[in-house]
Amino acid sequence: MLPQVILNHLGSIGEAASTWFSENKYFGSVGQCPPLPKGDLNYDIYMGYPEMFAWDKKRCVAYVSNLYNATVSTWDPYKSVVLDTIHFPGLSHAGNSASPNPLHASGIILRPDAYHAETLEVVIDNGDAFYSDGFNVSGPDHLMSIDLKTKEVTSQLRLNNGLYAGYADASLGPDGNTYVLGTYSSNILRVTPDKEISTFYVAEPLGPPRLYGFTGIAHVGDAMIVPDNIIGQLIRFDVRDKVGTPVTIKQTPYHEFKTANVLHFPERYNDTILLVAENMTPDYPYGGVSVYQDKTKQFNEVEFLGFLPSRLTNALTTSARQMADRIYVVALPTDGANITVAGESSRFPFQDITEELDLMILPEIKDEARDEI
């Protein structure tokens, strides 16, 4: 832990950084939601174990996917209170046992977009695909649709075809289609608004053995970005293609990863910054967030700016996303009987990394800030 005088100094630099960004119109729009206070937030729910969240800019709440019990909670970060929790009949469960029900809640998106959210889509995946290291891809895996006015399930679409699975994330493409990403073998499904499913991409061979491949997914323009943990590279697809063709994104300097998870383009930085959560690294056993930049927003190649380690211990970093005007890291505690089940935790800190990101993205403002302190 840093001495308070250093923390105060960093806070002053961070405030100056935020002022610099705002004056230079670097920040993207954050909608009508009021700003959140600086500092970490606490997501309090018994056995919640969050993996990621989606920010509703219409209602100013977050929808949090509770991994181990396959539920989704509506959370008000301003009041630090869980408003409700959506349970899926026949799918959601207690979470403290992976037998007979190993289902998870993972990828989560808003339709038609975060500003006019009417429908929530959630991936309910078979955790056994991950526990078995890709051997069991039998499913079931579902894409659930929920009416945000009534909180009722309006659609339950089975994703799995028995050949490849490991579904862990989803993203809404610029073409209006939902893209669901699988890990074993690396694959991407395209789901139309009419719930028609096609395979946009699948890596050969189908296995087994199946290696830990694609994980997170995010869109910027017509580009779809995913991390390939097998080769430790960021991969780019063009959603305008009928069938996806993977293209490796050049990194300068190269940053190796093997446990990348959720990806995110924060609106705060006008889609010029890509955040990649990493569960763990050789240097940081509890993971953190790698930061990439492309000022052109094309993401044909990126500059690796650095890595922000998680401040939590005994937890795996799973995602880093924007909520209102700030960026938070979500980490999954590993206090269960094993990695496949929930423990007894009731409080889950969301780490605020906004100031650290601001300074990393434009380090030259440190000198300007110090002159003002």
From Swiss-Prot:
The organism's place on the tree of life at top rank: Eukaryota
Description of the deletion phenotype: Does not affect the production of trichothecenes.
SUPFAM superfamilies: Calcium-dependent phosphotriesterase (SSF63829)
Stretches that traverse the bilayer: none
Induction remark: Expression is positively regulated by the trichothecene cluster-specific transcription activator TRI10.
Biological role stated in the UniProt entry: Part of the core gene cluster that mediates the biosynthesis of trichothecenes, a very large family of chemically related bicyclic sesquiterpene compounds acting as mycotoxins, including T2-toxin. The biosynthesis of trichothecenes begins with the cyclization of farnesyl diphosphate to trichodiene and is catalyzed by the trichodiene synthase TRI5. Trichodiene undergoes a series of oxygenations catalyzed by the cytochrome P450 monooxygenase TRI4.
Family: Belongs to the TRI14 family.
Name by which UniProt lists this protein: Core trichothecene cluster (CTC) protein 14
Organism of this sequence: Fusarium sporotrichioides
